[in-house]
């Protein structure tokens, strides 16, 4: 389902800094939720600024080092920047954020599609995805997959923020001028534009390590 858009709220003209309702992870993954950092997370929020957060929404964009300096809650951010879904004037909305999940295969996909940037600018739209999937029957091991489809440099940052410098992950080039091009051409799984990490009770590491 989608949220924060005219499709979900036809009367809304302001679609900046929105968040989904809390998603019950125990209904998608194991009965205990999803492993992340130092425990099992049971609730996830999807935020329009290119991230998901655990336990609480993260509505605003913070111009701080990420991962590391952004305040609570815990976050996974494919492409964290000051996004704005609000259409220009009366034009048709093309930006949207939506989710898909399967309780039988224990996976959740989030898509940020044609996202604009602050102050209703849509000249540099960004499209990317986050795919979370259960790797073991017990639910104690989860794949975190980033997929980048179309990006433009807007000063974005990305990674996995656990609030612990020893376990957090920073995507290649995060915060730099070539971040977008690196995400589209680099990979850690031999597929350009795709990065996969694994979360379990031992922390977070690159897939295959």
Regions found by a protein language model. Name each.
Residues 1-209:
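Extracytoplasmic Ser/Thr/Pro-rich, glycosylation-prone low-complexity segments
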